[in-house]
Amino acid sequence: MAKAKFERTKPHVNIGTIGHVDHGKTTLTAAITKVLHDKYPELNESRAFDQIDNAPEERQRGITINISHVEYQTEKRHYAHVDAPGHADYIKNMITGAAQMDGAILVVAATDGPMPQTREHVLLARQVGVPYILVALNKADAVDDEELIELVEMEVRELLAAQDFDEDAPVVRVSALKALEGDEKWVKSVEELMDAVDESIPDPVRDTDRPFLMPVEDVFTITGRGTVVTGRVERGVVNVNEEVEIVGIRPGTTKTTVTGVEMFRKLLDQGQAGDNVGLLLRGIKREDVERGQVVVKPGTTTPHTEFDGQVYILSKDEGGRHTPFFNNYRPQFYFRTTDVTGVVTLPEGTEMVMPGDNTDISVKLIQPVAMDEGLRFAIREGGRTVGAGRVTKIHK
Protein backbone atom coordinates (compact mmCIF):
# COMPACT_ATOMS: atom_id res chain seq x y z
CA MET A 1 0.00 0.00 0.00
CA ALA A 2 1.70 3.19 -1.17
CA LYS A 3 1.99 5.82 1.56
CA ALA A 4 1.69 9.36 0.30
CA LYS A 5 2.28 12.08 2.81
CA PHE A 6 0.09 15.14 2.92
CA GLU A 7 2.00 18.16 1.73
CA ARG A 8 0.55 21.61 1.48
CA THR A 9 3.29 22.34 -1.03
CA LYS A 10 1.79 20.11 -3.70
CA PRO A 11 0.84 21.91 -6.89
CA HIS A 12 -2.89 22.68 -6.97
CA VAL A 13 -4.68 22.04 -10.26
CA ASN A 14 -8.31 22.70 -11.25
CA ILE A 15 -9.83 20.13 -13.58
CA GLY A 16 -13.25 19.05 -14.74
CA THR A 17 -15.10 16.35 -16.63
CA ILE A 18 -16.68 17.37 -19.94
CA GLY A 19 -18.59 15.47 -22.62
CA HIS A 20 -21.98 14.33 -23.90
CA VAL A 21 -24.88 13.67 -21.54
CA ASP A 22 -25.00 10.05 -20.25
CA HIS A 23 -21.48 9.23 -21.37
CA GLY A 24 -20.55 8.88 -17.69
CA LYS A 25 -18.97 12.16 -16.55
CA THR A 26 -20.42 11.99 -13.05
CA THR A 27 -19.87 8.23 -12.68
CA LEU A 28 -16.23 8.74 -13.66
CA THR A 29 -15.88 11.55 -11.12
CA ALA A 30 -17.21 9.21 -8.42
CA ALA A 31 -14.90 6.41 -9.61
CA ILE A 32 -11.84 8.69 -9.41
CA THR A 33 -12.63 9.62 -5.81
CA LYS A 34 -13.17 5.97 -4.85
CA VAL A 35 -10.05 4.64 -6.56
CA LEU A 36 -7.84 7.38 -5.09
CA HIS A 37 -9.43 6.90 -1.66
CA ASP A 38 -8.60 3.19 -1.79
CA LYS A 39 -5.06 3.91 -2.97
CA TYR A 40 -4.29 6.79 -0.55
CA PRO A 41 -6.92 6.55 2.22
CA GLU A 42 -5.32 9.21 4.40
CA LEU A 43 -5.42 11.75 1.56
CA ASN A 44 -8.84 11.22 0.05
CA GLU A 45 -12.44 10.68 0.93
CA SER A 46 -14.69 8.73 -1.39
CA ARG A 47 -17.76 10.49 -2.84
CA ALA A 48 -20.80 8.50 -3.97
CA PHE A 49 -22.39 9.13 -7.36
CA ASP A 50 -25.55 10.68 -5.92
CA GLN A 51 -23.53 13.06 -3.72
CA ILE A 52 -21.95 14.45 -6.88
CA ASP A 53 -25.05 14.23 -9.05
CA ASN A 54 -27.16 16.33 -6.67
CA ALA A 55 -25.07 19.34 -7.49
CA PRO A 56 -25.72 22.37 -5.29
CA GLU A 57 -26.83 25.60 -6.92
CA GLU A 58 -24.31 28.42 -7.14
CA ARG A 59 -24.81 31.97 -8.25
CA GLN A 60 -22.13 33.42 -10.46
CA ARG A 61 -22.51 36.87 -12.00
CA GLY A 62 -26.25 36.68 -11.43
CA ILE A 63 -26.64 33.28 -13.08
CA THR A 64 -27.67 30.14 -11.21
CA ILE A 65 -25.60 27.08 -12.05
CA ASN A 66 -25.71 23.57 -10.65
CA ILE A 67 -22.18 22.43 -10.11
CA SER A 68 -20.36 19.88 -7.97
CA HIS A 69 -16.90 20.40 -6.53
CA VAL A 70 -14.89 17.43 -5.28
CA GLU A 71 -11.27 17.39 -4.28
CA TYR A 72 -8.72 14.62 -4.26
CA GLN A 73 -4.98 14.05 -4.29
CA THR A 74 -2.56 11.92 -6.21
CA GLU A 75 0.98 11.45 -5.00
CA LYS A 76 2.05 14.47 -7.07
CA ARG A 77 -0.82 16.93 -6.92
CA HIS A 78 -3.89 18.27 -5.21
CA TYR A 79 -6.92 18.49 -7.53
CA ALA A 80 -10.15 20.43 -7.37
CA HIS A 81 -12.56 18.76 -9.77
CA VAL A 82 -15.80 20.24 -11.10
CA ASP A 83 -18.65 18.30 -12.60
CA ALA A 84 -21.62 20.12 -14.11
CA PRO A 85 -24.40 17.57 -14.50
CA GLY A 86 -26.63 19.31 -17.05
CA HIS A 87 -25.58 20.42 -20.51
CA ALA A 88 -26.87 23.96 -19.91
CA ASP A 89 -25.05 24.05 -16.55
CA TYR A 90 -21.84 23.05 -18.27
CA ILE A 91 -22.16 25.81 -20.87
CA LYS A 92 -23.01 28.42 -18.24
CA ASN A 93 -20.07 27.34 -16.10
CA MET A 94 -17.63 27.51 -19.00
CA ILE A 95 -18.74 30.97 -20.07
CA THR A 96 -19.13 32.57 -16.62
CA GLY A 97 -16.04 30.88 -15.23
CA ALA A 98 -17.75 29.79 -12.02
CA ALA A 99 -15.06 27.15 -12.00
CA GLN A 100 -11.91 27.75 -13.99
CA MET A 101 -10.22 24.71 -15.47
CA ASP A 102 -6.49 24.16 -15.93
CA GLY A 103 -7.33 21.06 -17.91
CA ALA A 104 -10.25 18.78 -18.68
CA ILE A 105 -11.02 15.09 -18.95
CA LEU A 106 -13.20 14.58 -22.02
CA VAL A 107 -15.46 11.60 -21.34
CA VAL A 108 -16.54 9.74 -24.48
CA ALA A 109 -18.55 6.51 -24.34
CA ALA A 110 -16.72 3.87 -26.37
CA THR A 111 -20.17 2.49 -27.22
CA ASP A 112 -21.29 5.75 -28.90
CA GLY A 113 -18.24 7.70 -29.97
CA PRO A 114 -18.27 11.52 -30.17
CA MET A 115 -21.80 12.99 -30.08
CA PRO A 116 -23.09 16.56 -30.71
CA GLN A 117 -22.46 17.74 -27.13
CA THR A 118 -18.98 16.18 -27.22
CA ARG A 119 -18.15 18.49 -30.11
CA GLU A 120 -19.84 21.47 -28.51
CA HIS A 121 -17.96 21.02 -25.24
CA VAL A 122 -14.60 20.74 -27.01
CA LEU A 123 -15.36 23.85 -29.08
CA LEU A 124 -16.34 25.75 -25.94
CA ALA A 125 -13.25 24.55 -24.11
CA ARG A 126 -11.18 26.02 -26.95
CA GLN A 127 -13.10 29.31 -26.91
CA VAL A 128 -12.84 29.80 -23.17
CA GLY A 129 -9.17 28.89 -23.07
CA VAL A 130 -9.00 25.50 -21.32
CA PRO A 131 -5.29 24.75 -21.82
CA TYR A 132 -5.35 20.95 -22.16
CA ILE A 133 -7.75 18.06 -22.78
CA LEU A 134 -7.14 14.36 -22.38
CA VAL A 135 -9.65 11.59 -22.98
CA ALA A 136 -11.37 8.90 -20.94
CA LEU A 137 -12.96 6.35 -23.29
CA ASN A 138 -15.63 5.18 -20.89
CA LYS A 139 -17.78 2.01 -20.98
CA ALA A 140 -14.81 0.26 -22.63
CA ASP A 141 -15.90 -2.97 -20.90
CA ALA A 142 -19.00 -2.98 -23.13
CA VAL A 143 -17.08 -3.03 -26.44
CA ASP A 144 -15.45 -6.32 -27.44
CA ASP A 145 -14.49 -5.27 -30.94
CA GLU A 146 -10.95 -3.82 -30.89
CA GLU A 147 -11.39 -2.27 -34.35
CA LEU A 148 -14.50 -0.42 -33.23
CA ILE A 149 -12.80 1.07 -30.19
CA GLU A 150 -9.80 2.12 -32.31
CA LEU A 151 -12.18 3.84 -34.70
CA VAL A 152 -13.77 5.79 -31.83
CA GLU A 153 -10.31 6.76 -30.59
CA MET A 154 -9.40 8.05 -34.06
CA GLU A 155 -12.61 10.09 -34.25
CA VAL A 156 -11.89 11.66 -30.86
CA ARG A 157 -8.34 12.55 -31.88
CA GLU A 158 -9.64 14.20 -35.06
CA LEU A 159 -12.10 16.19 -32.97
CA LEU A 160 -9.31 17.42 -30.67
CA ALA A 161 -7.07 18.29 -33.62
CA ALA A 162 -9.90 20.24 -35.28
CA GLN A 163 -9.97 22.58 -32.27
CA ASP A 164 -6.17 22.82 -31.97
CA PHE A 165 -5.91 20.59 -28.92
CA ASP A 166 -3.12 18.01 -28.65
CA GLU A 167 -4.20 15.15 -30.91
CA ASP A 168 -1.57 12.94 -29.29
CA ALA A 169 -3.14 13.49 -25.87
CA PRO A 170 -3.54 10.36 -23.74
CA VAL A 171 -6.72 8.40 -24.53
CA VAL A 172 -7.32 6.01 -21.64
CA ARG A 173 -9.87 3.19 -21.86
CA VAL A 174 -11.88 3.02 -18.66
CA SER A 175 -15.05 1.64 -17.16
CA ALA A 176 -16.19 4.00 -14.43
CA LEU A 177 -19.01 1.68 -13.37
CA LYS A 178 -16.80 -1.42 -13.12
CA ALA A 179 -14.17 0.60 -11.23
CA LEU A 180 -16.84 1.71 -8.74
CA GLU A 181 -17.83 -1.94 -8.32
CA GLY A 182 -14.19 -2.71 -7.46
CA ASP A 183 -13.31 -4.75 -10.57
CA GLU A 184 -9.50 -5.00 -10.40
CA LYS A 185 -8.81 -4.52 -14.11
CA TRP A 186 -10.96 -1.38 -14.36
CA VAL A 187 -9.75 0.07 -11.05
CA LYS A 188 -6.32 -0.06 -12.65
CA SER A 189 -7.67 1.80 -15.70
CA VAL A 190 -8.77 4.72 -13.51
CA GLU A 191 -5.33 4.74 -11.82
CA GLU A 192 -3.80 4.92 -15.31
CA LEU A 193 -6.12 7.80 -16.19
CA MET A 194 -4.99 9.76 -13.13
CA ASP A 195 -1.33 9.06 -13.94
CA ALA A 196 -2.04 10.53 -17.39
CA VAL A 197 -3.73 13.58 -15.79
CA ASP A 198 -0.67 14.06 -13.54
CA GLU A 199 1.71 13.82 -16.48
CA SER A 200 -0.10 15.64 -19.27
CA ILE A 201 -2.01 18.56 -17.73
CA PRO A 202 0.62 21.28 -17.32
CA ASP A 203 1.18 23.04 -13.99
CA PRO A 204 -0.89 26.23 -14.01
CA VAL A 205 0.87 29.59 -13.92
CA ARG A 206 0.12 30.95 -10.48
CA ASP A 207 -1.71 34.27 -10.34
CA THR A 208 1.13 35.81 -8.34
CA ASP A 209 3.56 35.09 -11.20
CA ARG A 210 1.56 37.12 -13.73
CA PRO A 211 1.87 40.90 -14.29
CA PHE A 212 0.22 43.04 -11.61
CA LEU A 213 -3.40 44.13 -12.11
CA MET A 214 -5.92 45.56 -9.63
CA PRO A 215 -9.40 46.77 -10.60
CA VAL A 216 -10.31 50.03 -8.87
CA GLU A 217 -13.37 49.65 -6.64
CA ASP A 218 -13.16 52.86 -4.65
CA VAL A 219 -11.15 56.10 -4.50
CA PHE A 220 -10.72 58.42 -1.56
CA THR A 221 -8.42 61.10 -0.21
CA ILE A 222 -6.45 60.86 3.01
CA THR A 223 -5.64 64.39 4.15
CA GLY A 224 -1.92 65.04 4.12
CA ARG A 225 -1.14 61.73 2.43
CA GLY A 226 -2.85 61.77 -0.93
CA THR A 227 -5.19 59.60 -2.96
CA VAL A 228 -5.90 55.96 -2.14
CA VAL A 229 -7.48 53.45 -4.53
CA THR A 230 -8.88 50.23 -3.14
CA GLY A 231 -9.63 46.89 -4.75
CA ARG A 232 -8.79 43.21 -4.81
CA VAL A 233 -5.53 42.37 -6.56
CA GLU A 234 -6.51 40.18 -9.51
CA ARG A 235 -3.03 38.99 -10.38
CA GLY A 236 0.64 39.63 -9.72
CA VAL A 237 2.34 41.51 -6.93
CA VAL A 238 2.81 45.23 -6.26
CA ASN A 239 5.62 46.61 -4.10
CA VAL A 240 5.96 49.97 -2.39
CA ASN A 241 7.82 52.49 -4.60
CA GLU A 242 6.97 50.63 -7.80
CA GLU A 243 5.70 52.47 -10.84
CA VAL A 244 2.17 51.59 -11.99
CA GLU A 245 -0.17 52.70 -14.74
CA ILE A 246 -3.89 53.55 -14.52
CA VAL A 247 -5.77 52.21 -17.55
CA GLY A 248 -9.29 52.25 -18.98
CA ILE A 249 -12.53 54.29 -19.10
CA ARG A 250 -10.69 57.51 -20.04
CA PRO A 251 -8.58 58.23 -23.11
CA GLY A 252 -4.86 57.77 -22.49
CA THR A 253 -3.22 56.25 -19.41
CA THR A 254 -1.63 57.78 -16.31
CA LYS A 255 1.61 56.67 -14.70
CA THR A 256 2.24 57.05 -10.98
CA THR A 257 4.18 55.51 -8.11
CA VAL A 258 2.74 53.42 -5.28
CA THR A 259 3.95 55.10 -2.09
CA GLY A 260 2.08 52.81 0.28
CA VAL A 261 0.17 49.51 0.42
CA GLU A 262 -2.39 49.00 3.19
CA MET A 263 -4.46 46.01 4.18
CA PHE A 264 -6.83 46.00 7.17
CA ARG A 265 -5.31 49.36 8.23
CA LYS A 266 -1.82 47.83 8.39
CA LEU A 267 1.04 48.97 6.16
CA LEU A 268 2.55 46.27 3.98
CA ASP A 269 5.62 46.06 1.75
CA GLN A 270 3.59 44.48 -1.01
CA GLY A 271 0.12 43.43 -2.08
CA GLN A 272 -0.40 40.18 -3.95
CA ALA A 273 -3.07 38.31 -5.92
CA GLY A 274 -6.16 37.79 -3.78
CA ASP A 275 -5.43 40.60 -1.29
CA ASN A 276 -7.92 43.41 -0.70
CA VAL A 277 -5.66 46.44 -0.50
CA GLY A 278 -5.52 50.20 -0.59
CA LEU A 279 -2.78 51.72 -2.74
CA LEU A 280 -1.52 55.22 -1.98
CA LEU A 281 -0.65 56.90 -5.29
CA ARG A 282 1.84 59.74 -5.68
CA GLY A 283 0.70 62.97 -7.33
CA ILE A 284 -2.76 61.70 -8.21
CA LYS A 285 -5.86 63.76 -7.46
CA ARG A 286 -9.10 62.19 -6.35
CA GLU A 287 -10.72 63.14 -9.68
CA ASP A 288 -7.90 61.60 -11.77
CA VAL A 289 -9.03 58.05 -11.12
CA GLU A 290 -12.41 56.27 -10.93
CA ARG A 291 -14.06 52.92 -10.34
CA GLY A 292 -13.83 50.71 -13.42
CA GLN A 293 -10.24 51.61 -14.21
CA VAL A 294 -7.41 49.20 -13.43
CA VAL A 295 -4.00 49.77 -11.86
CA VAL A 296 -1.39 47.68 -13.68
CA LYS A 297 2.29 47.06 -14.19
CA PRO A 298 3.14 49.64 -16.90
CA GLY A 299 2.74 48.43 -20.48
CA THR A 300 1.08 45.10 -19.64
CA THR A 301 -2.58 45.91 -20.32
CA THR A 302 -4.19 48.14 -22.92
CA PRO A 303 -7.67 49.69 -23.15
CA HIS A 304 -9.97 48.56 -25.96
CA THR A 305 -13.43 49.36 -27.32
CA GLU A 306 -14.02 46.68 -29.96
CA PHE A 307 -14.01 42.95 -29.33
CA ASP A 308 -15.68 39.62 -30.11
CA GLY A 309 -17.19 37.58 -27.31
CA GLN A 310 -18.80 34.23 -26.66
CA VAL A 311 -21.95 34.81 -24.60
CA TYR A 312 -24.71 32.92 -22.84
CA ILE A 313 -28.05 34.74 -22.69
CA LEU A 314 -30.21 33.92 -19.69
CA SER A 315 -33.56 32.27 -20.28
CA LYS A 316 -36.77 33.80 -19.01
CA ASP A 317 -36.88 31.21 -16.18
CA GLU A 318 -33.43 32.31 -15.06
CA GLY A 319 -34.60 35.89 -14.70
CA GLY A 320 -33.35 36.95 -18.11
CA ARG A 321 -35.08 38.68 -20.99
CA HIS A 322 -38.52 37.55 -22.10
CA THR A 323 -37.90 38.46 -25.73
CA PRO A 324 -35.08 37.97 -28.25
CA PHE A 325 -32.65 40.74 -29.16
CA PHE A 326 -31.48 41.81 -32.61
CA ASN A 327 -28.56 43.56 -34.29
CA ASN A 328 -27.60 46.89 -32.69
CA TYR A 329 -28.82 45.75 -29.26
CA ARG A 330 -27.38 48.24 -26.68
CA PRO A 331 -27.00 46.76 -23.19
CA GLN A 332 -24.35 47.49 -20.56
CA PHE A 333 -21.27 45.31 -20.34
CA TYR A 334 -20.10 44.85 -16.76
CA PHE A 335 -16.31 44.39 -16.68
CA ARG A 336 -14.76 43.74 -13.25
CA THR A 337 -16.22 46.70 -11.36
CA THR A 338 -18.22 48.83 -13.78
CA ASP A 339 -20.84 48.97 -16.53
CA VAL A 340 -20.00 50.33 -19.99
CA THR A 341 -22.64 50.61 -22.73
CA GLY A 342 -21.91 48.81 -25.98
CA VAL A 343 -23.52 48.08 -29.34
CA VAL A 344 -23.89 44.44 -30.37
CA THR A 345 -23.41 43.07 -33.89
CA LEU A 346 -24.65 39.52 -34.46
CA PRO A 347 -22.79 36.96 -36.60
CA GLU A 348 -23.55 36.83 -40.32
CA GLY A 349 -26.78 34.91 -40.87
CA THR A 350 -28.03 35.29 -37.29
CA GLU A 351 -31.25 37.32 -37.25
CA MET A 352 -31.80 37.32 -33.51
CA VAL A 353 -30.71 35.75 -30.24
CA MET A 354 -33.27 34.03 -28.03
CA PRO A 355 -33.17 33.89 -24.22
CA GLY A 356 -31.33 30.65 -23.31
CA ASP A 357 -29.03 30.75 -26.37
CA ASN A 358 -25.28 30.87 -26.49
CA THR A 359 -23.72 32.74 -29.41
CA ASP A 360 -20.77 34.77 -30.66
CA ILE A 361 -21.20 38.56 -30.81
CA SER A 362 -19.11 41.59 -31.78
CA VAL A 363 -19.25 44.58 -29.46
CA LYS A 364 -18.30 48.24 -29.75
CA LEU A 365 -18.08 49.98 -26.35
CA ILE A 366 -18.64 53.71 -25.85
CA GLN A 367 -15.66 53.89 -23.41
CA PRO A 368 -12.41 51.93 -23.48
CA VAL A 369 -11.97 49.07 -21.00
CA ALA A 370 -8.67 47.45 -19.99
CA MET A 371 -9.01 43.93 -21.33
CA ASP A 372 -7.19 40.81 -22.43
CA GLU A 373 -8.58 37.86 -24.34
CA GLY A 374 -10.37 35.63 -21.86
CA LEU A 375 -11.70 38.47 -19.70
CA ARG A 376 -15.21 37.73 -18.45
CA PHE A 377 -18.13 40.13 -18.36
CA ALA A 378 -21.82 40.24 -17.55
CA ILE A 379 -24.44 41.71 -19.86
CA ARG A 380 -26.86 43.90 -17.95
CA GLU A 381 -29.95 45.99 -18.55
CA GLY A 382 -30.46 48.58 -15.86
CA GLY A 383 -28.45 46.64 -13.30
CA ARG A 384 -30.17 43.31 -14.00
CA THR A 385 -28.02 40.53 -15.42
CA VAL A 386 -29.33 39.17 -18.71
CA GLY A 387 -26.24 37.31 -19.91
CA ALA A 388 -22.60 36.48 -19.37
CA GLY A 389 -19.66 36.14 -21.66
CA ARG A 390 -15.97 36.28 -22.25
CA VAL A 391 -13.75 38.13 -24.67
CA THR A 392 -12.54 35.82 -27.44
CA LYS A 393 -10.81 38.35 -29.71
CA ILE A 394 -9.80 41.99 -29.43
CA HIS A 395 -10.01 44.23 -32.51
CA LYS A 396 -9.28 47.76 -31.37
Curated annotation (Swiss-Prot):
Residues in tr-type G domain copies: 10-205
Residues the record lists as binding Mg(2+): 26
An example molecular function term from Gene Ontology annotations: translation elongation factor activity
Alphabetical keyword list: Cytoplasm, Elongation factor, GTP-binding, Hydrolase, Magnesium, Metal-binding, Nucleotide-binding, Protein biosynthesis
UniProt subcellular location: Cytoplasm
EC number: 3.6.5.3
Binding site for GTP: 19-26, 83-87, 138-141
Known partners and oligomeric status: Monomer.
The name this protein goes by in its record: Elongation factor Tu
Natural source organism: Mycobacterium sp. (strain KMS)
Upper classification of the organism: Bacteria, Bacillati, Actinomycetota, Actinomycetes, Mycobacteriales
